[in-house]
């Protein structure tokens, strides 16, 4: 259980530190190019992965509560699972998933209360006029953008000929990466330990 807690804590610390720095240092939509294929691009996400939204104001609250319930059930499952002997790698994978999920839940639950809007200005932490939204209605901060291939389709293609093409468009954060890496590790290396 210590490995899961430690991994989750480190991921959560890195995730929230970077998100708070981005939120209080960048305008919404601002970019900082590290390489042509690695860009820090500040965006906010109201809903699920890839900006998919669910049912407006009420849907946002339901989605955030659903995330909290799933993480709670996941933690109980992990607690029961750790009574059996499972490998250190599987524990680290679980820690990445839980830490990432908690990181995005923090944004969804509290960022609307503790930050003001980032549209026309850089957000302030704990602004005098209050935050941009209410409890459970915050936006998840995303910043990593990797346009690994930025080109055009060949002109001879019948449907997309000459259209602009970017491979790996999603903008994501450390929490998203932790969840993805943790799931990938389980499916690739540790699937039999969870059967």
Give the label of every model feature segment:
Residues 1-195:
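Alpha-helical transmembrane bundles and membrane-interface segments of multipass inner-membrane proteins
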């Amino acid at each position: 259980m210590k490995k899961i807690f430690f991994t989750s804590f480190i991921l959560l610390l890195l995730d929230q530190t970077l998100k708070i720095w981005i939120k209080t240092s960048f305008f919404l939509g601002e970019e900082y190019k590290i390489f042509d294929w690695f860009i820090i691009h500040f965006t906010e996400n109201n809903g699920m992965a890839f900006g998919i939204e669910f049912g407006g104001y009420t849907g946002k609250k339901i989605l955030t509560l659903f995330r909290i319930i799933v993480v709670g059930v996941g933690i109980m499952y992990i607690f029961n699972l750790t009574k059996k002997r499972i490998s250190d790698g599987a524990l680290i994978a679980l820690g990445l998933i839980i830490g990432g999920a908690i990181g995005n839940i923090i944004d969804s639950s509290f960022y609307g209360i503790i930050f003001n809007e980032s549209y026309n200005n850089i957000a302030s932490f704990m602004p005098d006029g209050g935050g941009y939204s209410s409890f459970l209605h915050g936006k998840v901060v995303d910043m990593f953008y990797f346009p690994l291939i930025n080109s055009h389709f060949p002109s001879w293609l019948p449907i997309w000929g000459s259209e602009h093409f970017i491979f790996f468009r999603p903008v994501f954060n450390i929490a998203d990466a932790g969840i993805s890496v943790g799931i990938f590790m389980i499916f690739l290396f540790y699937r039999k330990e969870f059967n």
